[in-house]
Amino acid sequence: MNAPHPAPSLTKNVTRISRLDLPGAGQVYVQGNYAYLGHLPNKQNLGTTIVDVSEPRRPRVVSQINLEDPTSHSHKARVIGDLMIVNSERNMTAIGRKADELPKLRTQLRAALGRDPSDAELAGKLGVAVTDIPAVEEARRKPYDRGGFKLYDVADRAKPKLIHFQKTHGIGVHRFDMDANYAYISTEMPGYIGNILVIYDIRNPAKPEEVSRWWLPGQHLAGGEQPTWPGRQHRLHHALRSGDRLFAGCWHGGVRVIDVSDIRKPRTIGAYNYHPPFPEPSHTFMDVPRPTGGRHIALAIDEEDHAHDAREMERRRGRPHGCLWVLDVTDMAKIQPLAIFQVSELDSPYSRAAPGRFGAHQFHERIDDTLVYCTWFAGGLRIVDIADPAAPQEVGHYIPEPAPGQPGPQTNDVDVDKRGVIYLVDRGPGFDILEFKPR
C-alpha cells in the first residue's frame, strides 16, 4: 500500500527577511538601492511605490504616485538611470472589450427578436453576469482614452516629477522593456488587432519619438491583413532586448526573435509556437546571453491565463498548467525545445484554492548565472537551476501565506538585485523580501 503524499513544504532554502503590506502589484523592478512597484487596481488609486531597499531587512517607502484617473492602472514600472517609465492601461479590460461588442450585438438581437433585448439576453451573449451590464453600458458611454505611458524624472526618489505622458491607443500599454535610448512598448494602436510592438526614442524624454513598429502577420487590419485566429489570441505580450535582438512572448502565437540591428526596420528571424497542444499563452521570452551546457538557449514562461472557480478547475483537471520552457536557439531559423519545468499540484497546498490560478506567470528578466527565479501564482517562488538545460532542477522555493480574505497566494512578479536579494510581489497585498541560501 502506498503511503500518502506528505504535506508540501512552504519553503526550501529561502527565508523571508522583511515584508511591507503594500497593495497588490503587477511588477517589481530593482535598480541600485530602490525597488519600484507598479500596482494593480486598488482602493487607494495608487499607481507606483518607490521603496528604499539599501537595508533589505528594513525597507522604507520613500514616495508613492497616486493616479488622477480612476479608470486606469499603472501596474508596470522600469527605471534606467534617473528615468522611470510606467504604463497607463485600462481598468476592467474585459468589461471594456464587452462594451466594444455591445452596439453590434444589440442590433443583431433586436433584429432577431423583433424587440429590444433584455439585460439577461445581452449578458448571455456577451458571456458576463447580468449584474455586469450596467458597467458595460457605462464603459460604452465613456470610451477609454488614457492608454499610453508616463515618463518620470526620479533623480530625487522622494519626489518623482512627471516629464511627459505619451498617449498610444485602445486599452493602452501593458508590459515593456527599455534602455538608455529606446522604450520597447507593447500597446494597442489604431488599425491593428491586439498589442503590437512600438519602439520609441526616449533620449529626449520630454518628447518621445516613434521609431518603428513590429507585429504578427494578420494583426494589421488597416493594411488589409486578416487574422487566422479568434479575437486577440495572437498578440505581443512584451519583448526584451538582448544585443541586437528582441525576444518576444506572443501569447497564443508562441515566441519570436526580432532583429533590431536596424532599429527602424525590425524583422522576425526566429519563431516557435507550442500552441496547441499546450493551452496556456506565452508570457515572456528571454535570451540567455552565455552558452549553457554548450548551447545557446532562451527561456519562455507561460501565464496561467484566467482565475477559475472550483467548478471550472474541476472541468480543466488533467490539462497542463502554465510552465517554464527551455529552448535551443542556436539556429534561429530552427528553434527547438529542450525541456519544460512544471510544478505539481501536490507541491502547493493552495494549488486548487478557488477562485484563483495555480500555474506559471513570470520570471526574473535577467539571468546572471544558471538560476531562474520564477513565479507560480498559487505555487509561489520557484528557483530553477538550468546548468543542464535538458534537465532543469528546482533548488529552492517559497510559498507566501495568502493575503487576508484570499483563498491562496497569487504570486505575480519577482526581481533579484546584485546582492542576490529577492523581491516578490503578489496580486493581493504584500511585498516580500527574501534570501536564498542553498544547502
What kind of feature is each model-predicted range?
Residues 1-439:
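Feature marking well-ordered beta-strand scaffolds used for ligand recognition
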